[in-house]
């Protein structure tokens, strides 16, 4: 978690994904208006019900968090990404 835990307006998370890591077998949603996925290094594929979007280092994708989605890191490279979630879905001290 990059953003402060008590920040309710936005949540910023830096994630190191091992090669082949994924978000699980099923699509999921997040209770937020906007989700941004930015790839720092490696590659990741964002999956939606009707499409797949490959992303490489330097690429960003913005989408509604309530849209069913999933992701998978490149099998050889893995990925390092920044997730930005607006508003924050977790609030705590």
Residue ranges and their predicted role:
Residues 8, 56, 65-91:
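Ligand-binding loop in jelly-roll beta-barrel domains
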Residues 1-27, 34, 84-85:
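A short glycine-rich, His/Asp/Glu-containing loop-to-beta-strand
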Residues 22-23, 45, 52, 61, ...:
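Histidine-centered metal-chelating micro-motifs
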Residues 4-7, 53, 60:
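Short polar/acidic secondary-structure junctions
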Residues 25, 29-30, 34-57:
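A short beta-strand-loop-beta hairpin characteristic of the jelly-roll/cupin
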Residues 15, 38, 46, 61, ...:
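Preference for bulky hydrophobic residues occupying beta-strand positions
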């Amino acid at each position: 978690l990059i953003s402060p835990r008590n920040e309710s307006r936005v949540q910023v998370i830096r994630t190191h994904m091992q090669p082949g890591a994924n978000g699980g077998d099923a699509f999921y949603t997040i209770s937020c208006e906007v989700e941004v996925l930015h790839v720092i290094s490696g590659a990741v594929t964002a999956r939606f019900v009707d499409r797949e979007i490959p992303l490489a280092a330097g690429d960003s994708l913005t989408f509604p968090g309530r849209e069913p989605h999933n992701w998978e890191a490149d099998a050889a490279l893995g990925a390092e990404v920044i997730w930005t979630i607006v508003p924050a879905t977790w609030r705590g001290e």
